[in-house]
């Protein structure tokens, strides 16, 4: 049996690989090229795609799949199961760094951080350049889910960007912090088709049709929303920030609607502007204390873990739901499936 000292291994590897001839990456068959590209991090994939038009075309033929792209107004994030990339337009940069061009747009101070999987740069024309980066990623990869977050920049987004992006989304967050511009809200929701998460950081005075069927909905509500519109919501999770004292009426109406109809509601959370009068909320509901034989002690979903041992239980159409107060301000209504 032959034993090789560990100290000799590097020498043997060197002797082996120095005899191998270099090869052209793009000469590989498509499947082999794809397997190589899958093991390259996003920063180098981006650099490779910008090396030449030929590189970009060959990469497109590999149909590389990406789990999600998050479009924020000052950065773009790519995510897959094993790697990620943040493309940042808003951080301090090394102004001595080189420039790059993406689809005709120039980016100065192009700085790569491999430890954080991040590229930082200065766009020369912001509105055009962020679209160019997005479009490059959109063309280069097969992206499963799109997420847009333009909170605080909604007006600019509406005027310059919205109609130039794909309209079918997994999640959308927008709003200009209580500007109360219902026309902007309607315009954005008329354009986009949102499947999963919708968060509106603005004063909402009516329920838009697109709000009714998303899986998870978060709204800042005004008391002018008619109850008849509110009970049309059929979402799994509903989070409302209620600006006035009519929150109790909204809660009771939503619970009454749940008791009388089959809905998808799993968790209703309402943050009121004042402390809750819990007795008034429960009035006439025949609520009972927690019975550990009938439902769990905690509600857990994703990063949420709510202790429901002190919550009161009510029944409706062969289901049990719990209702309780957190931190004096948050009212939870949780349906157990």
UniProtKB/Swiss-Prot annotation:
A Pfam family annotated for this UniProt entry: F-box
Stretches assigned to the F-box domain: 22-76
InterPro entries in alphabetical order: F-box_dom
PANTHER family: F-BOX ASSOCIATED DOMAIN-CONTAINING PROTEIN-RELATED, F-BOX-CONTAINING HYPOTHETICAL PROTEIN C.ELEGANS
Protein name listed in UniProt: Uncharacterized protein F54H12.5
Organism: Caenorhabditis elegans
